[in-house]
Curated annotation (Swiss-Prot):
SUPFAM superfamilies: Zn-binding ribosomal proteins
Protein name listed in UniProt: Large ribosomal subunit protein eL37
UniProt organism field: Emericella nidulans (strain FGSC A4 / ATCC 38163 / CBS 112.46 / NRRL 194 / M139) (Aspergillus nidulans)
GO molecular function per UniProt: RNA binding; rRNA binding; structural constituent of ribosome; zinc ion binding
Keywords attached to this entry: Metal-binding, Ribonucleoprotein, Ribosomal protein, RNA-binding, rRNA-binding, Zinc, Zinc-finger
Amino acid sequence: MTKGTSSFGKRHNKTHTLCRRCGRRSYHIQKSTCANCGYPAAKTRKYNWSEKAKRRKTTGSGRTAHLRDVHRRFKNGFQVGTPKGARGPENH
């Protein structure tokens, strides 16, 4: 029996399937855990030894890009309406 390359050709069962949280094919079927995001754990899996992976997944890298300007609007108190100068000269 060989335990190297020739044995790998005989493998045909899927160990990982799609994860319902991160969408990657990293959910280990027998372990019932995701190798990428750590599902079903409450906290998302992330490590400091992979700075690049953290950069890919962090807030503001996808649909939450609008959060970049939330901080600026927070500083101004979430003002609404047109700014004072844009209304034209004020005549009383």
